[in-house]
Amino acid sequence: MSDALIRLEQVGVSFAGEAVLDSIDLAVAPGQIVTLIGPNGAGKTTLVRAVLGLLKPHRGKVWRKPKLRIGYMPQKIQVDATLPLSVLRFLRLVPGVDRAAALSALQEVGAEQVIDSPIQTISGGEMQRVLLARALLREPELLVLDEPVQGVDVVGQTELYNLITRLRDRHGCGVLMVSHDLHLVMSATDQVVCLNRHVCCSGHPEQVSNDPAFVELFGQNAKSLAVYHHHHDHSHDLHGSVIAPGAHVHGEHCKHG
C-alpha cells in the first residue's frame, strides 16, 4: 500500500522468550477504517503500542509516514477523585491548547456542555467523547482508538460509530480501532483484522443491516453495525498457540482408558 500512513511488516514481539506478536502485516491508508479484533491476551494492546512507537518490535519493522500526526484515544483513564481537574484543564494538558481549541474539539464530538465540569463527574459516554476530543486536538492524520465503545450500550455504540465515521469523512484521516467484540463491528469498517498473536484472518465485515432479523434485533441502530464472519484455517490452545493438525487437546470431555 504505497499511500499508507503506517505499515507493519512481519512484526514480532516477545516477552521472556514467549511470542506475543508473530509475523504481523498491517497497513492503514488515509480515509481507511481498520478494526482490530481478538480475544483477551491476543496481543492487541502490544500491537497498538508498536503502532504508537511506545514499543520497538524485536523482529520486522514499523514504517510511518514522515512527521505522521497520530491522535490516540485510550480505553479509559483513572483520575484521583480528590484532584481538582475540569474537562477544560484536562484538555489543556495537550501543549498549545487554549479554551477556544478545547471548546471546538468538544463541539465536534457533541460534548461541549461538559467543558467546565469536574472530569470525575461526567458519564461514561461523555468521557469517551472527551477522550476522542483530546485525540482530535493534534489534528491527526491517523486516529488510534483503543476500544472506544467499551462499556457503552448499543445505542451509545451506534452514536459513537456514526461520530467516528463523520470525523473520518470530515478530516480524511485513517482510523485504527481496537474492538472487544469478536463478531459485531462498525459497519463503516473497510477491513477487519482478527488477531491472536498472529493474523488469524482478515476481510470485510458482512453488510447485514438490511436483513429483517438483524433490523428486528437492533432496530434503528442496525445501519451502524455489521457482522464479521471469521475464516480461520487453524485453532488455538488455551495459551494462544496454534494447534497442529490432528493434535489432541486435553479438556473436560477427554476419555482415557
From Swiss-Prot:
Record GO biological process: response to zinc ion
UniProt superkingdom: Bacteria
Membrane topology: Peripheral membrane protein
InterPro entries named among the record's database cross-references: AAA+_ATPase (IPR003593), ABC_transporter-like_ATP-bd (IPR003439), ABC_transporter-like_CS (IPR017871), Metal_Ion_Import_ABC (IPR050153), P-loop_NTPase (IPR027417)
A matching Pfam family: ABC_tran
Protein residues bound to ATP: G38, P39, N40, G41, A42, G43, K44, T45
GO CC, alphabetical: plasma membrane
EC class: translocase
Gene3D superfamilies listed in its UniProt record: P-loop containing nucleotide triphosphate hydrolases
Catalysed transformations (reactions): Zn(2+)(out) + ATP(in) + H2O(in) = Zn(2+)(in) + ADP(in) + phosphate(in) + H(+)(in)
Family assignment from sequence similarity: Belongs to the ABC transporter superfamily. Zinc importer (TC 3.A.1.15.5) family.
Quaternary context: The complex is composed of two ATP-binding proteins (ZnuC), two transmembrane proteins (ZnuB) and a solute-binding protein (ZnuA).
Name recorded for this polypeptide: Zinc import ATP-binding protein ZnuC
Gene transcribed to yield this protein: znuC
